[in-house]
Swiss-Prot record:
Places the protein is found: Cytoplasm
Cellular component GO terms, alphabetical: cytoplasm; membrane
Enzyme class: transferase
Function: Involved in the biosynthesis of lipid A, a phosphorylated glycolipid that anchors the lipopolysaccharide to the outer membrane of the cell.
Protein name: Acyl-[acyl-carrier-protein]--UDP-N-acetylglucosamine O-acyltransferase
GO BP field: lipid A biosynthetic process
Alphabetized GO MF terms: acyl-[acyl-carrier-protein]-UDP-N-acetylglucosamine O-acyltransferase activity
Gene3D superfamilies: Hexapeptide repeat proteins, Udp N-acetylglucosamine O-acyltransferase, C-terminal domain
SUPFAM superfamilies for this protein: Trimeric LpxA-like enzymes
Phylogenetic classification of the source organism: Bacteria, Pseudomonadati, Pseudomonadota, Alphaproteobacteria, Hyphomicrobiales
Organism: Brucella canis (strain ATCC 23365 / NCTC 10854 / RM-666)
A Pfam family per the record: Acetyltransf_11
Classification via NCBIfam families: lipid_A_lpxA (TIGR01852), PRK05289.1 (NF003657)
């Protein structure tokens, strides 16, 4: 394992926990209490507050600022944290805020995530593994992003919204409602534009499961019954599909937001814009 390197112009305060093989570049500032895992690299002009933990192998590009106070007037300055997983890529100008003391108290980032230039993660968010934020993505406080989700450039997600795993949000979309697993949100305000078929294929999902999800979405969003009742109808019609069960579990969780739905003129709430099916 390589030796830890700290550039002469960097400020690493006493009380920082540095792993083996860490590289701290020019003009970085790492505050007391920060935990930097093995083989992390801070390129230059990076600020890591003492409320931050970086998992091993994470690389942070210039002018990123991690772990500052939440932009939440209810936060009273109590001890909270930002926890970043292993092998993440955090590009130029990214900001991530720690949690609030009036909420769950920490912001969590999963493993193997990529945050492209100037993306923003607000307080108390929960982000899964293998998530991609494209340039200038912004998510509000208390937002939940599932594993393998992709957020296109300039997309904005309202506070408290839940985005399911393997979902896709198009560039410049404004998402104000919960997005189902495997769903695709497009537009301002964003609507459900179908399923993330390309992402499902890339993940190796079987064709049968893709068909099951298509059927489930058509049933869920036909607007003839309350959505929780429709969800039970879906389980009865497609009882043995793990992906459909995941989707229905997402629907059945209590939420502060509505659901991202197809446009009113979409026939039977169908899966428009997901035509990349074999």
């Amino acid at each position: 394992m390589k030796e830890t390197f700290i550039h002469p112009t960097a400020l690493v305060e006493p009380g920082v926990e540095l792993g083996q093989g860490v590289s701290v570049g020019p003009f970085c500032h790492v505050q007391s209490g920060a935990i930097i895992g093995n083989d992390c690299e801070l390129m230059s002009h990076v600020v890591i507050t003492g409320a931050t933990t970086l998992g091993a192998g994470t690389k942070v590009y210039p002018h990123a600022i991690l772990g500052c106070d939440p932009q939440n007037n209810k936060h009273k300055g109590g001890p909270t944290r930002l926890n970043v997983g292993v092998n993440c890529i955090i590009r130029e100008g990214v900001t991530m805020h720690k949690g609030s003391d009036n909420a769950r108290g920490y912001t969590s980032i999963g493993d193997n995530c990529s945050f492209l230039a100037y993306a923003h993660v607000a307080h108390d968010c929960d982000i899964g593994d293998y998530v991609t934020f494209s340039n200038n993505v912004m998510i509000g406080g208390h937002t939940s992003i599932g594993h393998h989700a992709i957020l296109g450039g300039g997309a904005a997600v309202h506070q408290f919204v839940r985005v399911g795993h393997h979902a896709f949000i198009g560039g410049l979309a404004a998402v104000v409602s919960d997005l189902i697993p495997y769903g695709m949100a497009i537009g301002v305000h964003a609507h459900l534009g179908g399923l993330n078929i390309i992402g499902m294929k890339r993940s190796g999902m079987e064709r049968k499961e893709i068909h099951n999800l298509r059927h489930a979405v058509r049933m869920l969003f036909d607007r003839t019954k309350p959505i929780r009742q429709r969800a039970q109808d879906v389980l009865a019609a497609i009882p043995d599909s793990p992906t459909v069960s995941d989707m229905i579990s997402f629907i059945n969780v209590d939420t502060k937001r509505a659901y991202c739905t197809p446009p009113l003129d979409a026939a039977h709430g169908g899966a428009g814009h997901d035509s990349d099916e074999d």
